[in-house]
A protein has these predicted regions:
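Bacterial N-terminal signal peptides that target proteins for export
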Residues: 1-10
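N-terminal signal peptide c-region/cleavage motif recognized by signal peptidases
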Residues: 19-23
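Hydrophobic alpha-helical context, especially transmembrane and signal-peptide helices
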Residues: 4-5, 15, 132
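Flexible, solvent-exposed loop/hinge segments and secondary-structure transition points
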Residues: 25-272
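Bacterial N-terminal signal peptides
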Residues: 10-18
Length: 272
């Protein structure tokens, strides 16, 4: 009887361990232990992101001069840091926290060592059919791919959001966003190492301030890398039809619409 009981216990234990193993493999988005367990170790820290963000917000006067959220992801899409520029988490649009993470994920997911694409560059390409564009954009449907992991985006203690211990840190949030504010990060070897996303104002201001944050972090080493902006010194810059675009009164190609208090994209610093 004792031998039979022991065999039953061992068999049950084996089944439980197998189930746990399968669950761990099927839920590979969980289990990271902060930023030190992944590719975040070579990217800016929370403190560095916060400092770069506050400086960028202060330096830019486009949009409505609102406070911002910023997120950095590594090359695997793992969130490394989340920060805000205001006095507390309620000083900027609460919904923009997840949007900033979506933008970072998008810019990382669709940029390469040889091709930098900002989230602003994707706006027209994902549009459906219309009178102005009877055939629709060449990437229509992209915005519905790679959905946000809602457990990562909305889980954890709300009091920790935007701090060093933001619940998204160490996890892959996913998501696709197709207006300005997301930029890939390039190291001194001109290799893409992750991406940055900003949200909290007009999408044009989001792009401008993300551009300044990337420069402040020293991760704008993409001179000579391919892009769709038509400006080799700013490969992944935002494109507006009436300023640096096709000037055909249609938002098409790689353009996105202008915003309130829009500035000329060529006024942004050239990349390195």
């Amino acid at each position: 009887m004792q031998k039979t009981t022991l065999i039953q216990i061992l068999a049950t234990s084996t089944i439980l361990l197998s189930a746990l193993s399968v669950h761990a493999e099927s839920d590979g988005n969980r289990g990271y232990v902060g930023r030190n367990a992944n590719g975040c170790k070579g990217l800016p820290s929370y403190e560095q992101l916060k400092s770069a963000l506050v400086s960028a917000v202060a330096a830019d006067s486009t949009g409505f001069n609102l406070n911002m959220w910023a997120t950095i992801v590594d090359r695997d899409g793992v969130v490394c840091a989340v920060a805000f520029s205001g006095a507390d988490r309620g000083s900027q649009w609460p919904g923009s926290r997840v949007i900033s993470a979506q933008k970072a994920n998008t810019a990382n997911a669709f940029s390469l060592d040889g091709l930098a694409l900002s989230t602003a560059n994707l706006y027209s390409a994902v549009q459906g059919t219309s009178d102005a564009s009877p055939l629709g954009g060449s990437l229509y449907g992209l915005q519905f791919s790679n959905p946000v992991d809602t457990a990562v985006a909305y889980g954890g203690n709300p009091a920790a959001v935007g701090t060093k211990f933001d619940p998204m840190v160490g996890n892959r949030v996913g998501g696709i966003n197709v207006f300005g504010g997301g930029l890939a990060l390039y190291n001194s070897s001109k290799k893409v190492v992750g991406a940055l996303g900003l949200s909290g104002d007009t999408s044009c201001a989001d792009h401008n301030q993300a551009w300044l944050v990337r420069k402040n972090l020293g991760l704008d080493n993409l001179a000579g890398i391919g892009g769709v902006s038509g400006d080799a010194t700013r490969p992944d810059n935002i494109v507006y039809d009436s300023i640096n675009g096709n000037s055909n009164n249609i938002t098409d190609g790689w353009e996105q619409p202008i915003c309130a208090n829009t500035s000329n994209p060529t006024s942004l610093p050239a990349v390195k």
